[in-house]
Amino acid sequence: MLTLQDKEDSLMKLNSKRIDFEYTPSEEIFTFSEDTGLPFLFDVDEELTDNPSAMDAVGEMLDEAETLAEKAKAAIKAALSDQGAPYHDLVTFFMQFHRDDVGSDIAADLFPGTDPAKLSFIEMVDFLRLKRFGSLVDYKMDQQVFIMDLSFNPEITDELMVIYFDLKKEIFCITHES
């Protein structure tokens, strides 16, 4: 049985310029903002934490989380602009729900300083915030992927735009979850 000292001896340091973070190999990472200083939740599946190259990729992607969030927002805007885009209907539904279906008081809270009824769906994308960033193994692809949750305001709505990135920092899937 592992003692506390054994666990402390087995701690690994995440290779990140952004945060000073230690983790235990083979244990899931799930942290809140107050634990890391990051402005979002951070999580990594346990099967990745004992793989140094996978964790190096986590550190690199974590250092670029906001840049990747901007890339995700650009992809959402592109999907909104092109009715033939694969995710057009999905992202349109997400935007329509938050502007037209939540009620005017909630919409006003989601989009402060605006008249939500006059906002275009593309303008709404700029209000999305990074809520969570993590990494897991996609069993269909049999590879490590990165997952990002974007939300208008997690204290008001639990609806998310979930963006999946591959190891090359390319988006391969956009979903809507709650």
Where do the PLM segments sit?
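Long, contiguous N-terminal structural blocks used for assembly/anchoring
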Residues: M1-G113
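Acidic, proline/glycine-rich low-complexity IDRs
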Residues: L2-I29, I122-S178
